[in-house]
Amino acid sequence: MDNSGKEAEAMALLAEAERKVKNSQSFFSGLFGGSSKIEEACEIYARAANMFKMAKNWSAAGSAFCQAAHVHLQLQSKHDAATCFVDAGNAFKKADPQEAINCLMRAIEIYTDMGRFTIAAKHHISIAEIYETELVDIEKAIAHYEQSADYYKGEESNSSANKCLLKVAGYAAQLEQYQKAIDIYEQVGTNAMDSPLLKYSAKDYFFKAALCHFCIDMLNAKLAVQKYEELFPAFSDSRECKRIKKLLEAHEEQNVDSYTEAVKEYDSISRLDQWLTTMLLRIKKTIQGDEEDLR
């Protein structure tokens, strides 16, 4: 069956579902099994939505899932309603990102009302990702990652909470909200230090915190590095610590060439990602006579 045939079938199913909902509201249906008609309508709306998905009509699929969700709410089937709102959100992601967010928020309201905070956290991440990639609203992405982290923390899912917080820190630093980023990197780094599995990554978080300090002020960064060495002696011997000290030295001497050389050395061992490149360039711009290139 081609897409137009699938759409026609989906439209017929929608009409059937709507008839059942309408009939269930009549007086006699109320006496004789109105709720069973509504249950059937839910099922038919979902079938229509899946048929629209097969036809790649994502908006129509999303709308049909939403209708199913509203009917589930009439039946007090909260969990089924939330599932349908999530299905609607996933369909709308491909056609209308803002509507996808609206549907996911409806699902989150239901899940939090039911005390299902881990699932709510997961959907806040989905919303954050839509703001990151589709709507490019980083402030809103940050807000949803923070909310997700709060819910994960409340459920003692600290590893998942930290992943969200690290996203917040990365974006906060890009938006020049350095203190916010520092607080998170230090908090996650301190927690990682105490874990045999995670302590290797602590040096990376302290390195990033030091770079954020460096973007504020060189003396800030120097004091921060000393603090991290005392707090986590393994940091002193790390490549990250040696690198930040070389960068500090070059900056103190206002030597652009030494600074660039230190960055090149670091890049030759572990490639610079976009975030590190941005931070290192911002610091380099504070050296007199720089020509705004790291290589």
Curated annotation (Swiss-Prot):
PANTHER family: ALPHA-SOLUBLE NSF ATTACHMENT PROTEIN, SOLUBLE NSF ATTACHMENT PROTEIN SNAP
Chief site of localization: membrane
UniProt subunit comment: Interacts with PRKCABP, and disrupts the interaction between GRIA2 and PRKCABP, leading to the internalization of GRIA2. Found in a complex with VAMP8. Component of a SNARE-like complex that contains at least ZW10, USE1L, RINT1, STX18 and NAPA/SNAP-alpha. Interacts with VTI1A. Interacts with STX12. Interacts with GNA12 (via N-terminus); the interaction promotes CDH5 localization to plasma membrane.
The name this protein goes by in its record: Alpha-soluble NSF attachment protein
Gene name of this polypeptide: NAPA
InterPro entries: NSF_attach (IPR000744), TPR-like_helical_dom_sf (IPR011990)
Chain positions with N-acetylmethionine modification: 1
Annotated tissue distribution: Widely expressed. Highest expression in brain.
Subcellular location: Cell membrane
Role noted for this protein: Required for vesicular transport between the endoplasmic reticulum and the Golgi apparatus. Together with GNA12 promotes CDH5 localization to plasma membrane.
Source species: Bos taurus
A Gene Ontology molecular function term of the record: soluble NSF attachment protein activity
Topology in the lipid bilayer: Peripheral membrane protein
